[in-house]
Structures are given as structure tokens and as C-alpha cells.
Amino acid sequence: MSSLKLQKRLAASVLRCGKKKVWLDPNEINEIANTNSRQNIRKLIKDGLIIKKPVVVHSRYRVRKNTEARRKGRHCGFGKRKGTANARMPTKLLWMQRQRVLRRLLKKYRDSKKIDRHLYHDLYMKCKGNVFKNKRVLMEYIHKKKAEKQRSKMLADQAEARRQKVREARKRREERIATKKQELIALHAKEDEIAAKAATAGH
């Protein structure tokens, strides 16, 4: 029996696959052994004496099934764990994820004019200082701050209105007093004039 090493190599080159994927018909070994050119190999491939084997299926069914189970929390007990908690889920990674969420929210609020740049900077530094443990806490804090700001503004406006009212009342009172004063002065002047005329007439 002759060696078919050359034919196998040429067939692999023509079929563009590995030598392991080439199937040579065992019943036609003599005919295959006589071929020594690519052209003849192509002819044999066309005739079906040389075939490219199909890809061996490497099923991922078990992997998918296991992954699905892990998503539900199976196979993750203490007995399955090898590394430390920090190795399995680094605290730095958790911190980065949290900061990105909080900073994205702050940026969105600043761009939509829900918060001004001063409050943005204040909250940004608070996020960096680990004040807010999640997005909900930050949102609640922002709403609370805005409500406080609105309330203080309303109280300031009310106080200003009250002061304005008092100022106007004082002004009106001063005007009334001044008017009365003028009237009294005019009355006294008139009385003095009448008295002077009466004294002149008596002489």
C-alpha cells in the first residue's frame, strides 16, 4: 500500500483546510496514489473520491444551561467559591460603577437646568466623599435641597413683602404727621394774624 501523504497535503491545500479534515476513499487508493498534481486532485474532489470532512460539532448546550442556572443564583454557594470576595467582585470596580451612575445623573440634571453649577459642584464633591450610597439617595437629596431652597426663597420674599409693607405704612404715617404739622402751623399763623389785626384795631 502506497503512502498518500502527498495527495493528502495537496488536497488540504486545494480544499483550504487541515490534513485531518481530508477524507480519501479507501476503495480507490490506487487511483488516488497515481495523482500527483493539484489539477488531478481537483478532478478527484469533483468525482467525490476526496471529500472535506464536516466540522465536528462542539455543543454549547451544557454551557448555556449552566450559565442560565448561574443567573438564577445556582452553583454559586460557598463550596463553589475559590477567590476572596474582593477577587470575585473588586470593591474598586463597584465604586467606579457607582460613581459613574451618580456623575451621569448629576450631568443630566445640570444640562437640563434642574440644578445650577454651584449645587452640581457641591454634590459632585459629596459623591466623591461617599455621601450617597446609590442613585435614589442622591435624587432624594436633590429634591430635598430644591424644596428647602424654594421654601427659604418664599420666606425671604414674604419677609421682604412685610418689610415693604411696614416701610410704606411708616411713610404714609410720616406723611400724615407732616401734613397735620403743616395744617397746625398754618392754623397758628392764621390765629396770630387775626390776633394781630384785632390788637391793631383796638389801638
Curated annotation (Swiss-Prot):
Composition skew (Basic and acidic residues), residue ranges: 159-175
InterPro entries named in the record: 60S_ribosomal_eL19_sf, Ribosomal_eL19, Ribosomal_eL19_CS, Ribosomal_eL19_dom, Ribosomal_eL19_dom1, Ribosomal_eL19_euk
Keywords (A to Z) from UniProt: Ribonucleoprotein, Ribosomal protein
Spans annotated as Disordered: 152-175
Pfam families: Ribosomal_L19e (PF01280), Ribosomal_L19e_C (PF25476)
One of the record's GO cellular component terms: cytosolic ribosome
One function term, GO molecular function aspect: structural constituent of ribosome
Family: Belongs to the eukaryotic ribosomal protein eL19 family.
Name recorded for this polypeptide: Large ribosomal subunit protein eL19
Organism: Drosophila melanogaster (Fruit fly)
